[in-house]
Design a protein with these regions (language model features):
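Hydrophobic, glycine/alanine-rich multi-pass transmembrane helices and their short helix-loop junctions
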Residues: 3-7, 28-40, 90-157
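Short alpha-helical segment immediately N-terminal to, or the first helix within
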Residues: 6, 67-74, 108-109
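Hydrophobic transmembrane alpha-helices and their membrane-interface caps
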Residues: 13-65, 152
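Residue-level signature of transmembrane alpha-helical entry/exit and packing/kink sites
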Residues: 15, 19, 47, 80, ...
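Juxtamembrane/interfacial segments around transmembrane helices
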Residues: 42-53, 68-76, 141-156
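Transmembrane helix-bundle signature of multi-pass membrane transporters/permeases
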Residues: 49-56, 85-89, 123-127
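Helix-loop junctions and hydrophobic alpha-helical segments within the transmembrane domains
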Residues: 72-95
């Protein structure tokens, strides 16, 4: 569903693939940590974490992608567009990510229910991982796949829509 929404919003075939891949990478990193630590998770953890972290991270990714597209439409080259998108969206991504972290970490610390504490710990860590991945990896994906994005997106550079 997220793939289709991104595809319709950006009128692109490649952007949903790139954004969902970056988001899923952040989720996999988050879920891999307890595995490698040998920590057991509640049976619903992967479903809950996948859904909530996906929802939070897609906002960060859409924010940066929208700004990147706007800068490309203004005629900026890919490096300048990525740099501006990165600088302008980073404060919002960081404040949103840290707020999400603080809320879930607070619940994890004070929850008396083990399942809630465990899931909120994963969500808190996922907020930080997602924030870092969108800030560091998504701009690199824009740099690598700029030509593909421009060719597989309708009106990405400001042409016909």
């Amino acid at each position: 569903a997220i793939f289709i929404i991104i595809m319709l919003i950006f009128k692109s075939i490649s952007l949903p693939i790139i954004l969902v891949a970056v988001i899923e990478f952040a989720i996999m990193v988050n879920m891999a940590i307890p595995f490698y630590q040998g920590t057991s998770l509640p049976f619903v953890a992967s479903i809950v974490i996948g859904a909530i972290q996906l929802g939070a991270t897609v906002d960060y990714a859409i924010l940066m992608t929208t700004r990147y597209q706007k800068e490309r439409q203004r005629g900026r080259d890919k490096m300048e567009a990525i740099s501006i998108a990165h600088k302008t969206s980073m404060p919002s991504i960081i404040s949103s990510g840290l707020s999400f972290f603080a809320a879930t970490f607070g619940v994890a610390c004070y929850s008396q229910v083990e399942m809630i504490g465990s899931i909120c710990t994963l969500l808190a860590r996922g907020a930080i991982i997602s924030m870092v991945v969108v800030i560091l990896i998504l701009p690199a994906m824009f740099m690598i796949f700029d030509k593909v994005i421009c060719k597989t997106s309708i009106g990405f550079l400001g042409g016909k829509k």
